[in-house]
Amino acid sequence: VSSIAILGFAAPTLIAVYRAGVDKHIVIVLIGLSIFALGIEATSILTGFPYSRFVYGNMIGGRVGGLVPWTVPFAWVPLVIGATARLATLRSHPLFSLMCGFYLMAIDLLLDPAAVKLGFWTYEYGSAYYDVPLQNFGGWVMTGTLATVVWTFAFRKTAHGDAIATLFLTCAFWSSVCLFKGLYIPAVIGALLAVDALRWAEAHKKQNRAVFSPVN
């Protein structure tokens, strides 16, 4: 796994954005979410909030300010977009953003144990769940919810089924890693998420053309 792999997983979402027509509005939102991703990671590294205190290794790209790898926005923002795509039928629900936050937390139940096992990052204090602090998962709910609020506020209509491919690739790959490393609970979670993403994509083939309608 390297920065190239992270960009590869992000590619379907980036292609979806490109197909939609890259305008100033989309660029501003994506840059804003990327800065948020870098900033919240740096805050957690320095203060322990919201993910718990941790430190990155050198395996996934050079670190911005010596703290956060530049690849983080390419890993995280596409997952946010994918979550809003997967749960798009619930968009009118008042708790839509929170549901996306919990969906992203489910993905992290897969990602974090594998990343810790491979030495991508190390927490100061772990837990019984594969040395990942439970606080970290609450942090994912919080940041995922906030990011979804921004995304859905910026775009009145978002149909971007192509972004589901990022979810599938990410979950399928990391569930395989977890299985190989003996992390069986995360492996099962990842397999379920991957199958769900694949089934969703099959059921919504006609909606796979990306459309972004900004709020005026």
Sequence positions of predicted segments:
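Aromatic-rich, lipid-facing transmembrane alpha helices and their immediate juxtamembrane interface loops
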Residues: V1-N216
